[in-house]
């Protein structure tokens, strides 16, 4: 998206909606498309208690693996976490426009602004 995100898409880059992978330079970590193209599915269950429980341990947690189950007493649908925001973000349903932005989404959701977030471990690089 070109213009003043998220208010004005001028389409100067030729992409009114989705942009092909690697349309923009990698970030300082060598990662592409971490925010703004599509929301990215993660393998994490949406559990409103998980991070509060971690914080209550008063210790540094390195690479938390996420909750074992979904939990939200206000919504009984089982949900996974999506991260990063998309080209369709607006103030009405995007809390922020950053890589760590997260939302709960039904596991059977299929939208053009949902994709996958893949990861690579050091062992996979070797």
Language-model-derived ranges and their functions:
Residues 5-19, 34-126:
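Surface-exposed recognition segments
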Residues 24-27:
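Short, small/polar residue-rich loop motifs at catalytic or cofactor-binding pockets
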Residues 1-2:
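Cyclic nucleotide-binding regulatory module and flanking cytosolic helices
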